[in-house]
């Protein structure tokens, strides 16, 4: 048994060193808890930070944008505007559709928001049109959030109406029931219906108006209760043939009698099985299809939801005929899983590199095993806490663990190096462990809490960015805390059992060679340090110059919000002139699809034309382009987008806007491009004056690309100007006119066919094949009070005007959204500055208000809080260090190292052509924590040497620098190699990881060189300052 000297107290580590079994079992418990926790952690791309968002869709076929706005959107908005917790309300009123998107505060639970929305819809019901085919339908989904999965259903044998019916009843409903699914939409509009196409001439010749036909159909097709009777012995339920379910039945329906002879519907109309909406269409790789888009609820886990759907699909497709093919075209989880797997590989690579650098410096296998055990134990133990906090395995938490690899090994290295030093001096391993751990314990605590203090401000960041990085900060802090516990318990215990004087002295050729190199480096460093200490003011000038350069770089470096990721999916909008027809738009879509599918990087394409809850106008088409896997294509997504836009520009009469789909979605509206800027006014007239001026100005700016607006006020309008006096004299009301027009041209849903599985509509319209366009209005006849038929032209004149295709509101006021991209060579910060200057130059009137939206607004908020965040980190660290050192001055000495980290990170980002975005800023904040560790290790030993050995401050700091040079170099290289895999990342999601790695590697390289010289100089200067202050204070007291 080793006899312990009295000084070998061991501090907080003593109990764990002396009880190896208990220590081992405690560490095994941490390891098992982490392994079990890992199995329960969900996988996702990013932390769940969605705003609670609900979309309310109301369809009113045939209604103009003005009617939809006044009759549907406005009543709903008035009710929604009274809800508590509402953050923003945006609406879009188009021909036949109203879409209101409600975004609530982050703190409001989605279920509570849902209850408020339902209550508001109920309150607005009495204010909505009586002939509304369906009440407003809400979905817990963000319309700007791209689908997690897109499926294409095609058939070479069956009509699309029959395919849609099967998909809707057998597939879509079941998928909608999956936990996490917010909305399943079927694009293509081929829902079955009975279409009644009236022959205007036949009606006129028989003296029948369309309202008579409509009334006859609705009266003939009913599905209501008929009662029952209860006899003495039997109960009987009443039923009747009150339902008509096929086109043949409707064709034979008698609608009137003329001259005693029946007039059947087939005599005055073409009756056929068709689609409910003839102006909707979808294609998959140019083949007609039903495109099924699955969107998740805000907050739902993408991976879990998609995996459940994938398991369910085989069962669902078995119920479909063999001629119906279901193909998954888009599954976002594929790229998310690939990105997470790449990050996990980089984490393992970081661990391997860190262990390699430890062996390089320690040159001893037992000594290398000790920190090699500490690293995975600290990381795996973190998983247990992550489960408790409802975190997930995502890119940010894995990045935190990758960076933590370099952090957590630092504590173990410092402990091992100090214990090894005493063993090499001849101490027994147990005594050396107690003495070395006791001596270094305060340093470990200082390092740990000062590093965690850097992360504290991240926990208090507000809004979406704060939620995003909370998991990152907490995961890293937990790993660091577990590392400190391991370093003060397991590490010294293992040193006492595994290290010995003989093992440390046992060296091979490589060990001796590396030892000579390191000794030479230390000797050379000592010589340079002496020269630097002899020229303190010059060194101080270098430090101040570094600070000034950091400020300049911060001002001029390009700034962004969040890295643009290559997820292999491109979202597109095809825009055509505002008066384009459905047939013409479909043709242009096919021409653009031909161009897109010829690109070697494209794997598949889905497209959609028509107006529904996802597409606001007939002159726009939605496209989703799936690229080949990253390993199978030569170009990144931005290069592919530029190439596709160039090729599509040769298609006449259409403009293609493209943007890559991102994992982080902050917007609430589907936009043509990545960034949005909104104008809001009290009236549409004010917007119509200023929007064109601003668009014209922005399109000239080099900082912007693909500038467009959703302001569309040049749609063709046939204005029916009724002579009310003439109409009244003939007994014709405005209601009669509206009904006649609606019956003819509104694809009016006049009756419902009920079946056991679904409900189908009867659609009424005029057959305009023979008389297309405005000429069809000549066939409209209205019944007068004397029973005669009056042509519309007798009481009205038709004027051709221009009107809006869509009317947009933001928080109940008219608005328009300007969309833009940022071209190569410019940053989002440049674009924001350019737009702000253009707005100032135009000098908008007071009634026009402007605001950036979505990620651009988040960028402004993040940029405004960044300096405060860094300042808060510095202040938090100063407070912690001041408390630990019981000094006002020593924390300043430690914090003087920070500018060296900033200048290195900013220079590295500038050289790499990367922007200063929120990921890079997190890297700079972490550098603050890493770089100050060098100063802490120097100052701790210098203070101890002054206090215990009576050295002068110069001798003490000089000796501390030489003694701590090896662990400082080891810990810095460990942190650098931990960040290196992130910097060199090339796989899926690399865009997200590289800014963090670039900033940290650059900052560590520069700070490592500078702090080794600036810290001792500043330490001595502050020491002289402290002595001068202390000399003056007694003198003043004597004078007093």
From Swiss-Prot:
Transmembrane parts of this sequence: 16-36, 347-367, 369-389, 396-416, 440-460, 472-492, 537-557, 863-883, 888-908, 911-931, 968-988, 998-1018
Main localization, broad class: membrane
Localization per record: Cell inner membrane
Gene Ontology CC: plasma membrane
UniProt membrane topology term: Multi-pass membrane protein
InterPro entries associated with the record: AcrB_DN_DC_subdom (IPR027463), Acrflvin-R (IPR001036), Multidrug-R_MdtB (IPR022831)
Keywords attached to this entry: Cell inner membrane, Cell membrane, Membrane, Transmembrane, Transmembrane helix, Transport
Family indicated by similarity: Belongs to the resistance-nodulation-cell division (RND) (TC 2.A.6) family. MdtB subfamily.
Family matches, as PANTHER family: MULTIDRUG RESISTANCE PROTEIN MDTB, PTHR32063
Subunit structure and binding partners: Part of a tripartite efflux system composed of MdtA, MdtB and MdtC. MdtB forms a heteromultimer with MdtC.
Protein name: Multidrug resistance protein MdtB
Organism: Cronobacter sakazakii (strain ATCC BAA-894) (Enterobacter sakazakii)
Name of the gene: mdtB
């Amino acid at each position: 048994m080793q006899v312990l000297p009295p000084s070998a107290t061991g501090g907080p580590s003593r109990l764990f060193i002396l009880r190896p079994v208990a220590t081992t079992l405690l560490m095994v418990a941490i390891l098992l808890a982490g392994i079990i926790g890992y199995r329960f952690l969900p996988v996702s791309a990013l932390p769940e930070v969605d705003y609670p968002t609900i979309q309310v869709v109301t369809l009113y076929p045939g209604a103009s944008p003005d009617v939809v706005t006044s009759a549907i959107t406005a009543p709903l908005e008035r009710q929604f505007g009274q809800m508590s917790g509402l953050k923003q309300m945006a609406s879009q009123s188009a021909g036949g559709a109203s879409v209101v998107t409600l975004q609530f505060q982050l703190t409001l639970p989605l279920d509570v928001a849902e209850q408020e929305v339902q209550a508001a819809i109920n309150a607005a019901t009495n204010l909505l049109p009586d002939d509304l085919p369906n009440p407003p339908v809400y979905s817990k989904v963000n319309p700007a959030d791209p689908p997690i999965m897109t499926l294409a259903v095609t058939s070479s044998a069956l009509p699309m109406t029959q395919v849609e019916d099967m998909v809707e009843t057998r597939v879509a409903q079941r998928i909608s029931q999956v936990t996490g699914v917010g909305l399943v939409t079927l694009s293509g509009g081929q829902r079955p219906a009975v279409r009644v196409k009236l022959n205007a001439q036949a009606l006129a010749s028989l003296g029948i108006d369309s309202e008579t036909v409509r009334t006859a159909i609705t009266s003939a097709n009913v599905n209501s209760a008929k009662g029952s009777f209860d006899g003495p012995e039997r109960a009987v339920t009443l039923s009747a043939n009150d339902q008509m379910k096929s086109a043949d039945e409707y064709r034979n329906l008698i609608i009137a009698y003329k001259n005693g002879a029946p007039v059947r519907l087939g005599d005055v109309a073409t009756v056929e099985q068709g689609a409910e909406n003839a102006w909707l269409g979808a294609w998959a790789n140019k083949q007609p299809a039903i495109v099924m888009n699955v969107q998740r609820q805000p907050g739902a886990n993408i991976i879990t939801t998609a995996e459940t759907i994938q398991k369910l699909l085989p069962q669902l497709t078995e119920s479909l005929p063999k001629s119906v093919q279901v193909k998954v075209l888009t599954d976002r989880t594929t790229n998310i899983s690939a990105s997470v797997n790449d990050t996990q590989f980089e984490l393992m690579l970081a661990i391997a590199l860190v262990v390699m650098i430890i062996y390089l410096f320690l040159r001893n296998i037992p000594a290398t095993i000790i920190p090699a055990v500490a690293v995975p134990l600290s990381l795996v133990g973190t998983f247990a806490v992550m489960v408790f906090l409802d975190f997930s395995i995502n890119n940010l938490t894995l990045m935190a663990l990758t960076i933590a690899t370099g952090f957590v090994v630092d504590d173990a290295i410092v402990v091992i190096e100090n214990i090894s030093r005493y063993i090499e001096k001849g101490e027994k391993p147990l005594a050396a462990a107690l003495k070395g751990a006791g001596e270094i314990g305060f340093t470990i605590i200082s390092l740990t809490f000062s590093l965690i203090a850097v992360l504290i401000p991240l926990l208090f960041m507000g809004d979406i960015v704060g939620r995003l990085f909370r998991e990152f900060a907490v995961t890293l802090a937990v790993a660091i805390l577990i590392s400190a516990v391991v370093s003060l318990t397991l590490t010294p215990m293992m040193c006492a059992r595994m290290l010995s004087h003989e093992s440390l002295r046992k060296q091979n050729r490589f060990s001796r060679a590396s030892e000579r190199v390191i000794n030479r480096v230390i000797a050379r460093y000592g010589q340079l340090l002496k020269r630097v200490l002899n020229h303190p003011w010059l060194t101080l000038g270098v430090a101040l110059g570094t600070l000034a350069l950091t400020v300049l770089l911060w001002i001029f470096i390009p700034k962004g919000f969040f890295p643009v990721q290559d997820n292999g999916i491109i979202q597109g909008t095809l825009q055509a002139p505002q008066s384009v027809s459905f047939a013409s738009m479909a043709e242009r879509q096919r021409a653009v699809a031909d161009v897109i599918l010829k690109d070697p990087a494209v794997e598949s394409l889905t497209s959609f034309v028509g107006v529904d809850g996802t597409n606001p106008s007939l002159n726009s088409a939605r496209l989703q382009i799936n690229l080949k896997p990253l390993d199978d294509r030569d170009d990144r997504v931005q290069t592919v987008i530029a190439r596709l836009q160039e090729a599509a520009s040769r298609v006449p009469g259409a403009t293609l806007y493209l943007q890559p789909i991102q994992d982080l979605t902050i917007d609430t509206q589907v936009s043509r491009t990545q960034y949005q800027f909104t104008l809001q006014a009290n009236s549409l007239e004010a917007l119509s004056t200023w929007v064109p001026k601003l668009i014209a100005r922005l399109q000239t700016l080099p900082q912007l690309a693909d500038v467009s607006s959703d302001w569309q006020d040049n749609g063709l309008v046939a204005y029916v100007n009724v002579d009310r006096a003439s109409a009244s004299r003939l007994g014709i009301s405005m209601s009669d006119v509206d009904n006649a027009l609606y019956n003819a041209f509104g694809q009016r849903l006049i009756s419902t066919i009920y079946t056991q599985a679904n409900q189908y509509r009867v659609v009424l319209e005029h057959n305009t094949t023979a008389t297309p366009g405005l000429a069809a209005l000549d066939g409209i006849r209205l019944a007068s009070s004397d029973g005669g038929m009056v042509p519309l032209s007798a009481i009205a004149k038709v004027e051709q005007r221009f009107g809006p295709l869509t009317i947009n509101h933001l928080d109940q006021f008219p608005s328009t959204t300007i969309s833009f991209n940022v071209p190569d060579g410019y940053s989002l910060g440049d674009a924001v500055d350019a737009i702000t200057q253009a707005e100032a130059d135009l000098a908008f009137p007071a009634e026009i208000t402007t605001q950036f939206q979505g990620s651009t607004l988040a960028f402004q908020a993040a940029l405004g809080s960044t300096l405060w965040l860094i300042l808060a980190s510095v202040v938090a660290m100063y407070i912690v260090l001041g408390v630990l050192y019981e000094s006002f001055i020593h924390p300043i000495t430690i914090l003087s190292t920070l500018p060296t980290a900033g200048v290195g990170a900013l220079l590295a980002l500038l050289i790499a052509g990367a922007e200063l975005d929120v990921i890079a800023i997190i890297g700079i904040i972490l550098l603050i924590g890493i770089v100050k560790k060098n100063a802490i290790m120097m100052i701790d030993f210098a203070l101890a040497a002054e206090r215990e050995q009576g050295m002068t401050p110069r001798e003490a700091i000089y000796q501390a620098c030489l003694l701590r040079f090896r662990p400082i170099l080891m810990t810095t290289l460990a942190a650098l190699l931990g960040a290196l895999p992130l910097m060199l990342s090339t796989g899926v999601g690399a865009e997200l990881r590289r800014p963090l790695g670039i900033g940290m590697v650059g900052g560590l390289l520069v700070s490592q060189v500078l702090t080794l010289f600036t810290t001792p100089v500043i330490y001595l200067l502050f020491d002289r300052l402290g002595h001068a202050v202390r000399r003056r204070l007694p003198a003043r007291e004597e004078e007093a």
